[in-house]
Amino acid sequence: MIDIKLLQKDFDYVVKALQKKGVDNALLNNLKDLALKTKQKRQEMEDVTAEQNLLSKEFGRYKKENLDISELQEKINALKTKKQELEDEVRTLEDDLNSIILSVPNMPDENVPFGVDENENVILEVIGEKPTFNFTPKEHWDLSCDWLDFERGVKLAKSRFTAIKGDGARLERALINYMLDFNRQRGFNEWYVPFMANSNTLQGTGQLPKFADDLFKIEGEDLYLIPTAEVSLTNLYNDEIIDKSELPLLLTSYTPCFRKEAGSAGRDTRGLIRQHQFDKVEMVAITSQEQSDEIFEKMVNCASDLLSSLGLCHQKVQLCSGDLGFSAAVTIDLEVWLPGQNKFREISSISNTRDFQARRAKIRYKEDKKNILAHTLNGSSLAVGRTLLAIMENYQQADGSVKIPEVLKKYL
């Protein structure tokens, strides 16, 4: 959640920042009017309180000097009534303001390149070498290794569900274990978390209320299937105050993820790229405000090194302002080379949300007896299904079989 105090203090600065993310001007103008009205009513309430305090002192003097207090009492009673009315108005305005603010995205960092969409993202570097083949490489769904059963996945559920079998299922499990071990070796503490979350939890990380249509809700319950372990890991510290000496908190977890993929009709309808259910190993960090840039770099490097350890060529991409996610202030995507598709595709997205999620989730740390909003960061390390298909395409053989990266053999 953006800082209401900053919004009221320097609205033009906030507007300029949010316009870089393509936020609708009508929403911003409504927000401005509501913020101004709330500020004015709050000032009226403070003025009434100040006047009450003065009259209370007068009341004490009148009583002490045995003066007639009837007229003064009427004024005090009138102010009490007015203050109650103003408190009710301010409460309603603040509820309305908070309702809108919960749907307003985070402001991008000032050094994030301006752009409208993914076409204006900036490639920072390419890491590793693309494999060469003496045959035309196939896309993963056309390989004859027979690991993916799309038809039975659809039969069991619906489109965008896949059953994985045999060596493919074993490789999926091996990748999960390898990714968790890799993250643990770099200082991340492993957690096993619920695969469901309540609405307060999802509001804390920014999925609700704005993205309710992309979530699978449990009918009759205040529970949703999680779209990412970021939700669970970040909210482990929801409404908590952490001693600064404990920071940074580096967390990792494997979970299945569930997304309706609303708005993705017609996109990536074949293969494992875009599924309603997929496995992912997640990294989350909770840091002090001065630590977050260093930890952001650590997380980007962790995911990149993981791809390199698997022998997968990939590129680092700086997202422009218009392609940033709702909660992100800055994001680096890692895109893996898929020779069958002859292009790079996203496999990890690492974001620093600054204090945006922490303000929503009330995650704070104590420093010099003061409670300070933490910074929260998150990133995939990695999306398991996309890593599986990347291995299938990069390690495919002419006969349709797939070699296994050396580092995974001990996990199989």
From Swiss-Prot:
Protein keywords: Aminoacyl-tRNA synthetase, ATP-binding, Cytoplasm, Ligase, Nucleotide-binding, Protein biosynthesis
Compartments it resides in: Cytoplasm
EC id: 6.1.1.11
Chain residues that bind L-serine: T228, A229, E230, E282, S380
Superkingdom field: Bacteria
Presence of keyword Aminoacyl-tRNA synthetase: yes
CDD domains: SerRS_core (cd00770)
GO cellular component: cytoplasm
GO molecular function: ATP binding; serine-tRNA ligase activity
Gene Ontology biological process terms from the UniProt entry: selenocysteine biosynthetic process; seryl-tRNA aminoacylation
Pfam families per the UniProt record, alphabetical: Seryl_tRNA_N (PF02403), tRNA-synt_2b (PF00587)
This protein's pathway: Aminoacyl-tRNA biosynthesis; selenocysteinyl-tRNA(Sec) biosynthesis; L-seryl-tRNA(Sec) from L-serine and tRNA(Sec): step 1/1
Binding site for ATP: R259, K260, E261, E346, I347, S348, S349
Catalytic activities: tRNA(Ser) + L-serine + ATP = L-seryl-tRNA(Ser) + AMP + diphosphate + H(+); tRNA(Sec) + L-serine + ATP = L-seryl-tRNA(Sec) + AMP + diphosphate + H(+)
Cited NCBIfam families: serS
Domain notes: Consists of two distinct domains, a catalytic core and a N-terminal extension that is involved in tRNA binding.
Homology family: Belongs to the class-II aminoacyl-tRNA synthetase family. Type-1 seryl-tRNA synthetase subfamily.
HAMAP family (alphabetical): Ser_tRNA_synth_type1 (MF_00176)
Function summary: Catalyzes the attachment of serine to tRNA(Ser). Is also able to aminoacylate tRNA(Sec) with serine, to form the misacylated tRNA L-seryl-tRNA(Sec), which will be further converted into selenocysteinyl-tRNA(Sec).
Record text on subunit structure and interactions: Homodimer. The tRNA molecule binds across the dimer.
Name of the protein this chain belongs to: Serine--tRNA ligase
Gene (UniProt): serS
